[in-house]
């Protein structure tokens, strides 16, 4: 579980594609208990559309330890610690402006796992959440990750070894936060080449049967 209470803003670069002209990415890291409306607004204002890339990292017993949201030019990385559960104002901000903001689509991998962790760990719901890959055995495979990124930017050559490194299972640590942030950025880039998907995860639905809407 993350115990840092600091926040930081840095600049990182993607290395998935052999293309030096892709602009640098601003990475803001903040503990949930220190989340501000400005941090959220800076992310949302950097969007050119309605789709966000999302990445999550889990600790022991699948407890959520880090959550990242990405546009093309900015990543907001939120870490959890022992005070996260009681950070009511900040949790409400996260819920209202990002997680349950129906004007924003949230795209990532294994989104049903994130939905469960948000509810069990923080008592939060998520709406307009979509899984980038939903076809059975391909989920979570390196071939699937590479395929999504390759289709997203056909004009650029994909560095497959970087994809394998970034998406390898590894514990989240602050000293490697840029690598985790790039997962969210990759989800943002990947979804830009995918048409609208019919299946949406909505854990705020009162009817349990309607929580996965087809």
Where are the predicted features?
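N-terminal accessory regions of nucleic-acid-interacting proteins
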Residues: 1-52, 124, 132-133, 180-186, ...
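Conserved DEDDh/DEDDy metal-dependent 3′-5′ exonuclease domain
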Residues: 51-52, 57-190
């Amino acid at each position: 579980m993350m115990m840092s209470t600091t926040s930081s803003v840095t600049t990182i670069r993607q290395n998935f594609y052999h293309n030096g002209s892709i602009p640098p990415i601003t990475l803001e890291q903040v503990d949930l208990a220190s989340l501000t409306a400005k941090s959220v607004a800076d992310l949302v204002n950097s969007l050119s559309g309605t789709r966000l890339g999302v990445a999550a990292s889990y600790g022991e017993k699948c407890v959520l330890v880090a959550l990242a949201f990405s546009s093309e030019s900015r990543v907001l990385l939120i870490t959890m610690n022992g005070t996260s559960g009681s950070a009511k104002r900040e949790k409400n901000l996260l819920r209202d402006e990002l997680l349950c903001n129906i004007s924003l689509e949230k795209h990532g991998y294994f989104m049903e796992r994130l939905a469960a962790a948000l509810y069990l760990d923080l008592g939060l719901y998520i709406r307009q959440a979509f899984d980038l890959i939903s076809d059975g055995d391909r989920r979570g495979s390196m071939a699937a990750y590479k395929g999504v990124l390759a289709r997203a930017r056909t004009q650029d050559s994909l560095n497959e070894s970087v994809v394998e490194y970034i998406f390898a299972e590894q514990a989240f640590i602050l000293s490697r936060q840029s690598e985790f942030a790039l997962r969210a950025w990759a989800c943002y880039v990947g979804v830009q080449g995918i048409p609208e998907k019919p299946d949406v995860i909505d854990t705020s639905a009162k009817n349990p049967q309607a929580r996965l809407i087809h």
